[in-house]
Amino acid sequence: MTDLIQMTYRDALKEAMREALRRDETAVIMGEEVGVWGGTYAVTRGLYDEFGAQRVIDTPIAEMGIIGVATGAAMGGMKPIAEIMTINFALVAIDQIVNNTAKIHSMFGGTMRAPVVIRTTAGWGQLAATHSQSFEAWFAYVPGLIVVMPSTAYDAKGLLTTAMYSQNPVIFIEHTRLYGEKGELPKGEFRVPFGVADVKRQGKDLTIVTYSRMTHVALNAAKDLAQQGIEVEVVDVRSLRPLDWATIMNSVRKTHRALVLTEDWMTFGVSGEIAARIAHDAFDYLDAPVERMTQAEVPLPYAPNLEKMAFPDEAKVFAKIKEMLA
């Protein structure tokens, strides 16, 4: 039986990177403050001391340059982990990511690859309008990129380990409010495959399809609903591209109702793609229209009371599901 240990989301990510650097001499980490400082969110703390400045590399504040160097290094046979402090700053590098990193393999006729792992953060945490955005849909829209958003320490380590073995570029999006969350995971290396959702809670009355921090909101709401005899199934997709449509459809065919719960905006967001596919592929099984809950369509306020109002929470999800089942 595998021994399980308790570890935070932050430390699980760090262990995945430590194992990769020990295992693969071509692996390097690069980004703003990742070395001496240990990362803005302390995810790389201690790795500079263990592996040195040649493998844990502090860069200038130049996101386009970070991704360009990482892409070139990957094309040359290295395995770079490029940290972009927040997904908001990834917009500065979007030309490199979308027009170079994502397309190298196809444009070279399959003879060249750029297996870069781009770690970044998304989500809210009193960081105001320009530092709290969720742009996962922008990157999930692009063929050639893998996009993942883990919700637990187990998934964070397993998916990052898989990313380090991948021969394709990976956008690895962490949530700023999950770094301190603890969870159980096995000792040593393990992988969580891309494109495989995890049913975090079994249920029969309704399916919530979600990911990242909203998984925890869904689980808490489901726990409260269970006290009233309502059994909600929670499907954490874990990766957005590729997305595990089979698990989603199997759940909806069982429960006959679906709520898509995300932290991005509703218009042209992830929730719309998932809802459309459910409505198309599982239409005959639905007892009610597919519903969506997302962030309010406003630039996010800094004030904590206004920020809280902009997002779904357990109480809002609870009320929405009661309405859907009425």
Language-model regions: role of each:
Residues 1-169, 173, 308-309, ...:
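Thiamine diphosphate
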